[in-house]
Amino acid sequence: MSTENTLSVADLARENIRNLVPYQSARRLGGNGDVWLNANEFPTAVEFQLTQQTLNRYPECQPKAVIENYAQYAGVKPEQVLVSRGADEGIELVIRAFCEPGKDAILYCPPTYGMYSVSAETIGVERRTVPALENWQLDLQGISDNLDGTKVAFVCSPNNPTGQLINPQDLRTLLELTRGKAIVVADEAYIEFCPQATLTGWLVEYPHLVILRTLSKAFALAGLRCGFTLANEEVINLLLKVIAPYPLSTPVADIAAQALSPQGINAMRDRVAQTVQERQYLVNALQQTACVEHVFDSETNYILARFTASSSVFKSLWDQGIILRDQNKQPSLSGCLRITVGTRQENQRVIDALRAEPV
């Protein structure tokens, strides 16, 4: 029998895909809980009514109402907005549009969001890491030393999973370092919790700046899978060349347009205020809990904390149906768990469970 006839289907796959470790999303990790505080979702659902019923027709590639509503909300021109299946698709589009596999590299600064790495590896693009400094700010010298051959640099601000904003002066320095050399992608998935820190006002000054946004967090629409890329028109036109013909279904576009109406944006801001209030309650309670070593500052809808025995705490709460996010495998996050801010009842269950832990 010839070798060709004995190859498995897996052997036919690209080598980098066979070796790929997929992103471990909260849903993929599973669990049988009733308090889900591991995916940075809003804890309660928002109701919408569909107004578009023409499901026999293909949708617009870039639904006009969604684009115009988001442009108005973000303070940019409609030509500077692209809508996609979550911000994750935006990550992939930028890499596909700007990076030559086997030639170019992306750069990111762990501990940070895992999809930058996974998307690049899937496409066959080199990944370079410049670990963040001890305070989780950018190592600008390390980044500068790694820019040769780097085509895209990803920065998450506020950073997931650490929760802090990146120093704006460091971001400006990074944009100057990369001018004419690389695209800088600022991931602003959590910017609604600290809107004063957005970089949208910098888009005119830095044509190589790309900003990622989402409806999954403050807009409470993680199940919708709707994200946005903000950039200058030239970048958007390049991304439109590689995006799928119909990225948003008609129901998704319908709900997204409603969420981005003046009424929808006001409701989002009310949710943010509620989340910030609950975050402070949770921080105060964690700081008075014996098994908690340190609670890190957060500008988001989640809190990172270091525990005296994080593995046993994580498992104990898991067994009680309280699902948190273990960060022990992330660089510099040994002993850390990430806790999404939930409802008052959910937050109290977390605190009660933690205070029952042996010290």
From Swiss-Prot:
Pfam families given for it? Answer: Aminotran_1_2
* Keywords from the UniProt entry: Amino-acid biosynthesis, Aminotransferase, Histidine biosynthesis, Pyridoxal phosphate, Transferase
Swiss-Prot/TrEMBL cofactor(s)? pyridoxal 5'-phosphate
Plastid recorded as keyword: no
So what EC number does this one have? 2.6.1.9
Keyword Heme belongs to the record: no
Q: Which reaction does it catalyse?
A: L-histidinol phosphate + 2-oxoglutarate = 3-(imidazol-4-yl)-2-oxopropyl phosphate + L-glutamate
Pathway annotation from the record: Amino-acid biosynthesis; L-histidine biosynthesis; L-histidine from 5-phospho-alpha-D-ribose 1-diphosphate: step 7/9
Tell me the CDD domains matching this sequence: AAT_like (cd00609)
| Annotated GO biological process | L-histidine biosynthetic process
InterPro entries the record matches:
Aminotrans_II_pyridoxalP_BS (IPR001917), Aminotransferase_I/II_large (IPR004839), HisP_aminotrans (IPR005861), PyrdxlP-dep_Trfase (IPR015424), PyrdxlP-dep_Trfase_major (IPR015421), PyrdxlP-dep_Trfase_small (IPR015422)
Its EC top class is transferase
- Provide the positions where the record notes the PTM N6-(pyridoxal phosphate)lysine: 217
Which molecular function terms from Gene Ontology are attached? histidinol-phosphate transaminase activity; pyridoxal phosphate binding
UniProt lists the family membership as follows: Belongs to the class-II pyridoxal-phosphate-dependent aminotransferase family. Histidinol-phosphate aminotransferase subfamily.
Q: How does it assemble?
A: Homodimer.
The record's listing under PANTHER family reads:
HISTIDINOL-PHOSPHATE AMINOTRANSFERASE, HISTIDINOL-PHOSPHATE AMINOTRANSFERASE-RELATED
Name recorded for this polypeptide:
Histidinol-phosphate aminotransferase
